[in-house]
Each structure stands twice: as C-alpha cells, then as structure tokens.
Amino acid sequence: LGHPEVYIVLLPALGIASEVIATNARKPIFGYRAMVGSILAIAFLSTIVWGHHMFVTGMNPFLGSVFTFTTLLIAIPSAVKAFNYITTLWKGNIQFNPPMLFAIAFVSTFITGGLTGIILGDSALDINVHDTYFVVAHFHLVMGISALYGMLAGMYHWYPIMFGRMMNKNLGYVHFWITAISAYGVFFPCLLYTSDAADEQLS
C-alpha cells in the first residue's frame, strides 16, 4: 500500500529516541501515556494514508479529500511525539554526548520531515510539487535520515552495555557533525530548489 513501511522503519527510531533522550536529560519522558497513544495512532493511521501518493493520477476528488484528511490527521500524533521530546529536554540536566546528539538530530529531521509532509498531504499543494526534489527531500529526511539517526543513537547508547567497552567520544562527535552537516547539506537545497521548479511548472 506504499506508506506503512515508512512508519514501520520509523517506529523503532521513535522508541530509541525516547530512551536516549530520557536517559541523557536525566528525567522521565514527558507525557508517557500520550507517547504510547500517539505511537499506536501512527501505527494505525499509517495504513490509511497511502492515497496521497496518487493525487496526480486522476483520483476521484472526494477520495482525494478523504486521503488529505487522513494524511493531515497523522500529523497530530507525530506532533505530540515531537512536543513531548522537546518538553522532556526542557530544564533537563542534559548530557550532550554522541547518542544524545543523534537523538536530538532525529527530532530535528522528524520535525522537518513532518512539516514537509503536511505540504505533501494537501492534494492542492501536492499537485504543484509532485515529481520535484521537494518529495525527494521529504522522503529521505523521514525514511532515511531519521531512521539512520535513530539507529546511530541506539548504537552509541547501547554499545557499552552490550560489549562492556566504551566508544571513543571524540570520534563520536566527529561522526555526528559530519553526518548532520552532510544530511542537511544534501537535502535542504532540494527543498529550496523545489520552489523554483514549482514556479516553472505553474508558469
């Protein structure tokens, strides 16, 4: 159906980010019940948003409105998770070690991907940016980079527990900054380039 797999890849990263942020902020995750409810809502809603990939195929306008609604609806539990991550950081005793930096970067790309997803979820806007680099940037920020940050945060966080050896923290910082700058360096220009491409399509 073309969309649940995005969230299936993201769900472990969401859980890892919750663990890493709570541990390194030295406080429990804010709104635990809301976090559980929102992850269940995301898991369910991800199965009924696939039609937003088909807005430009001559879809029935009523059906397009339904898929616009469900796609925008999934932004609510996603926003709850992002808000709770940020609120957990608020006034926390934060340790900015490599796993925490990757977890914060995950939240950053999750928010960026979510905001671009709202644009793509609206059928009127999606028609204008369909087949542009905007979609490429959105997809890779959400599916690729966010999942990668979650995996790396978990790797740096649990490696010492699993293997009884510490990883080199300085190399971890170098790894983080190269990855973060490269990821946004590749995909942020795609978002900017799209505005020119969309203008050319409209004119």
Describe every region a protein language model picked out.
Residues L1, W90, I111-T132, S195:
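Juxtamembrane/interfacial segments at transmembrane-helix boundaries in multi-pass membrane proteins
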Residues L1-E5, F67, T71, H130-M143:
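Short aromatic-rich membrane-water interface segments that cap or initiate transmembrane helices
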Residues L1-G51, V80, A105:
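Short helix-boundary/re-entrant hairpin motifs in multi-pass inner-membrane proteins
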Residues Y7-G15, L72-N84, G144-G154:
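Hydrophobic cores of alpha-helical transmembrane segments in multi-pass inner/ER membrane proteins
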Residues I29-F44, T87-G117, Y133-V136, L141-G150, ...:
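Interfacial and helix-entry/exit segments of alpha-helical transmembrane bundles
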Residues M54-P61:
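Membrane-interface helix caps and helix-loop-helix hairpins in membrane proteins
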Residues P61-I94, P98-A105:
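Long, K/E/R/D-enriched contiguous segments that form extended
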Residues Y193-L202:
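Single conserved hydrophobic/aromatic residue that forms the stacking wall/gate
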